[in-house]
């Protein structure tokens, strides 16, 4: 994922960033180091607390950023209802997860629904960082799911930067390319 992080260094100062499925808040820390104000959302209190520690370890004040515990789909709806918008939305879900509110999430079948739920929160001209390590989701299917969600939301993709699997994630015959990452600018 390191190949994607430097993109936060351009244009992140003063940006509002939503990191859904934040885990230990790696994307949030990188965005905050570049001057963004972040909102980290995750279903695990344990990992959000770890994320707060990562902010502190990186000389960032975690109290200047938001950490939201709860179901991502539920919170995407809540934030949209409150008309919250972000300059950058990061979607890097686990391949599989389960919550009481939303039930089962599988990246292979639900990535498009995730993008559809997140797009109302993305400002016009904003950037969507979409990533998955779901081996069963082919790159063309991943991009098609995102494109279908954008079209349904009447959001034109004006720029696309696909990041191939980096060298620190070796590709072998037994383990083909599974990491897919794309940066999209949407009108």
Predicted segments with their positions:
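Mobile active-site "lid"/loop adjacent to the S-adenosyl-L-methionine
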Residues: 86-117
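Conserved class I S-adenosyl-L-methionine
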Residues: 13-23
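C-terminal catalytic and target-recognition region of SAM-dependent MTase-like enzymes
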Residues: 127-187
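S-adenosyl-L-methionine
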Residues: 44-90
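Helix-to-beta-strand junctions that scaffold the AdoMet/dcAdoMet cofactor pocket
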Residues: 122-124
């Amino acid at each position: 994922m390191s190949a994607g992080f430097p993109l936060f260094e351009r244009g992140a100062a003063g940006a509002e960033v939503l990191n859904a499925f934040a885990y230990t808040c790696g994307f949030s820390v990188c965005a905050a180091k570049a001057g963004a104000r972040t909102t980290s959302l995750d279903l695990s209190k344990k990992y959000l607390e770890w994320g707060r520690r990562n902010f502190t370890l990186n000389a960032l004040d975690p109290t200047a950023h938001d950490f939201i515990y709860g179901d991502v789909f539920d919170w995407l709806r809540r934030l949209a209802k409150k008309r919250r918008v972000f300059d950058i939305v990061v979607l890097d879900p686990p391949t599989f997860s389960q919550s009481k509110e939303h039930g089962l999430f599988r990246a292979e079948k639900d990535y498009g629904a995730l993008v559809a739920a997140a797009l109302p929160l993305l400002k016009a001209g904003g950037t969507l960082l979409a990533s998955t390590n779901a081996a069963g989701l082919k790159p063309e299917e991943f991009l098609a799911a995102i494109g279908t969600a954008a079209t349904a939301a009447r959001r034109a993709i004006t720029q696309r930067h696909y990041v191939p699997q980096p060298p620190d994630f070796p590709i072998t015959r037994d383990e083909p390319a599974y990491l897919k990452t794309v940066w999209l600018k949407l009108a």
